[in-house]
Amino acid sequence: MRVAIVGGTGDFGLALARRLVEAGDEVVIGSRDAERAREKASEVGAAPGAANEEAVSGVDLVVLATKADAAIATATALAEAIGTTPVLSVASDLRSTDALSLAQRAQDLVGGPVVAGLHSLAAGKLAHGRPDEDAFVCGDDEEAKALALELAAKVVAGRALDAGPLSRARALEGMTAVIVSLNKRYKGHAGIRVTGLP
């Protein structure tokens, strides 16, 4: 799979790139700063990094891995360059009181299908290997969701689970806040593993 990671120079984007390169995917790291994207791409063995607009060209999946406060502006700025390519939104807005998730808001801006997922994964754990936990993906477009689930299965030691339609994205984004709270309270590195499924 050829994957563009927009925001790929940040902690989560870079950790995700590292795992996908290890899995044999062709990864293009995108950034507002093309030189920084090239530097980070060489660190993880990814394809040459590029400015975001160039990075999203000719890929199978675009991962929107910017910080939450930049996700919507980035989706807006890249809408034309992304075209109809599927987008996986991994950002979580921990302070939002908006009824719609970031992924749902992004869906209104880009021409292709948007799915959401990987919100329960911590950048720090992902940077050091495939976490022994499950990854969740939701979306309305089955083909786009299948691509995101394929990606998710490559980066966790647990399972990639279909969490339903895109309307579940708000709940998935909220998982981040719960995990952060648990880690602060118990001074740990919590992750999620679902039991009782076949």
Regions found by a protein language model. Name each.
Residues 125, 133-198:
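Active-site-lining helix/loop region of Rossmann-like oxidoreductase modules
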Residues 91-129:
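Rossmann-fold NAD(P)-binding glycine/threonine-rich loop
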Residues 52-86:
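Rossmann-like NAD(P)-binding element
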